[in-house]
């Protein structure tokens, strides 16, 4: 006797369950039927090993229950945390996630978007750095941290408020001369408001400050040169440092210690993101914490608003300060 190959058909499921083909179709497509009929179909499908052909169903319903996430990379802890939180938020709604890595490249982002559209996804969430990204008007599209235009919802944290919070926390902890360091892309995004909030707080309180704003491609050398010029014989001419990311804050803490300064006794440092240590669960450094889960939940909700009047072009979610050992409190 030969075994039948391939996935059983809906007709075979209907025969096994003793119901009509239409009833099987309703159960598979989540259309309400009597509980008795639903159980018969589910039991028959399980017995026969029937698997839903999602591609065929998407052709009928014009819906794939898949959302694409376009993200620069997964090596940065914040990007990894956001990707995980979005996957959780989508899973709660019965959606799968197609992840595409753009490497912060304009052409790469456009390819990622084209790939997502080829897969007939129901929407796209993107952390994009491409000012010329071509987005079709019919595509459900939400960005994180980069405002494109008023028709595309952008979800971010309160970056301006976070910069202000960091400066004022350093002042509260006794710092008298502050420094801001940034490493990032050349494309303006919501995170660039951190320096504006920092500068406003310094000016408002009459605190002297300096800034070093660099492109990530420049590497560590310009930061090292700055520290060499401003730390002499173990004494720095600044006592409070705010970095635009936790990762940069940790690198600078190491570089400052190499030059004979103590952290936090001589120089207090605050980062931004709220990245936790994988083993201990504590914060890597004192930091302005982004509400990662709330950002993810808001981005997913913004893809499918119940009322179009609820769509906001820019949503800035609140941040908070957390101690992580690189400040005195």
Which residue stretches match the model-derived regions?
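N-terminal helix-turn-helix DNA-binding module of bacterial transcription factors
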Residues: 1-64, 328
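Short, solvent-exposed amphipathic alpha-helices that sit
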Residues: 40, 78-92, 162-165, 189-208, ...
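Hydrophobic alpha-helical segments within soluble ligand-binding/sensing domains
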Residues: 153-180, 220-229, 249, 289-308
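An alpha-beta-alpha
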Residues: 166-209, 311-328
């Amino acid at each position: 006797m030969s075994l039948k190959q391939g996935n059983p058909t809906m007709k075979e499921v209907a025969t096994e369950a003793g119901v009509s083909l239409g009833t099987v179709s309703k159960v598979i497509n989540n259309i309400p039927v009597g509980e008795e009929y639903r159980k018969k179909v589910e039991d028959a499908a399980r017995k026969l090993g029937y698997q839903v052909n999602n591609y065929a169903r998407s052709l009928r319903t014009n819906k794939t229950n898949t959302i694409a996430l376009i993200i620069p990379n997964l090596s940065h802890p914040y990007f990894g945390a956001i990707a995980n939180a979005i996957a959780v938020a989508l899973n709660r709604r019965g959606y799968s996630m197609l992840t595409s890595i753009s490497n912060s490249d304009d052409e790469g982002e456009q390819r990622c978007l084209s790939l997502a559209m080829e897969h007939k996804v129901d929407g796209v969430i993107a952390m994009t750095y491409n000012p010329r990204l071509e987005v079709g008007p019919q595509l459900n599209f939400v960005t994180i941290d980069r405002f494109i235009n008023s028709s595309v919802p952008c979800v971010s944290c309160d970056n301006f408020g976070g910069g202000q919070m960091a400066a004022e926390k350093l002042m509260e902890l006794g710092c008298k001369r502050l420094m801001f360091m940034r490493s990032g892309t050349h494309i303006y995004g919501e995170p660039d408001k951190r320096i504006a909030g920092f500068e406003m707080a310094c000016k408002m309180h009459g605190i002297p400050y300096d800034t070093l704003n660099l492109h990530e491609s420049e590497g560590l050398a310009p930061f090292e040169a700055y520290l060499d010029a401003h730390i002499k014989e173990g004494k720095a001419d600044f006592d409070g440092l705010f970095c635009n990311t936790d990762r940069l804050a940790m690198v600078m803490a190491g570089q400052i210690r190499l030059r004979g300064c103590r952290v936090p006794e001589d120089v207090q440092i605050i980062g931004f993101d709220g990245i936790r240590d994988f083993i201990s669960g504590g914060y890597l450094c004192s930091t302005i914490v982004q509400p990662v889960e709330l950002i993810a939940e808001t981005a997913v909700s913004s893809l499918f608003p119940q009322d179009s009047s609820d769509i906001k072009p820019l949503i800035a979610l609140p941040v908070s300060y957390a101690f992580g050992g690189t400040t005195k409190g």
